[in-house]
Amino acid sequence: MKFIEIQNEVIAKYRINLCDGTKCKNDWSRTHAHPQKRRVCKWKQVNSVESTFTLLHEIGHIENNNSKMRRCEEEYYATAWAIGIMKQYGIADKISEKTKALYQNYILNERDRGIRRGGANYPTKEQLTLDW
């Protein structure tokens, strides 16, 4: 199965609307999700593992939408969801080490930023470590 076929299948299965960014109130520069509207904006469909993982990560935000989560937890659960779907399709092993490091570091940086800002009872780094 090609990556574009997987992308289209997942978009249909999870009832995701795509937007070029013209419906956004904020001028976001990168791909992002609007969970209440089940919308992913500014995602470019390309037949690649990176494009597929980006889409799945944003759908992960939609599928794991919980306003009580901290940012690091939102990112962790969205990424973990994306990894799970990649595993279901048998393509998780195609995610590059660079991409893995980027997502993991982003989660841990969000955790550290929350703690620096006075947040308490944050998950440990071990609890936020992704299982690739």
Regions found by a protein language model. Name each.
Residues 1-22, 80, 127-132:
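A metal-dependent hydrolase signature that marks the N-terminal structural subdomain at the beginning
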Residues 6-10, 58, 85, 102:
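Charge-rich, solvent-exposed alpha-helical interaction surfaces
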Residues 7-49, 62:
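Active-site scaffold of zinc-dependent metalloenzymes
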Residues 19-25, 75, 81, 104-108:
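Hydrophobic or amphipathic, alpha-helical segments that drive membrane association/targeting
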Residues 46-47, 88-132:
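Long, well-structured alpha-helical subdomains associated
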Residues 49-50, 73:
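Residue signature of alpha-solenoid helical repeat architecture, marking inter-repeat boundaries
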Residues 52-66:
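Active-site recognition of the HExxH zinc-binding catalytic motif
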Residues 65-89:
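Post-HEXXH active-site segment of zinc metalloproteases
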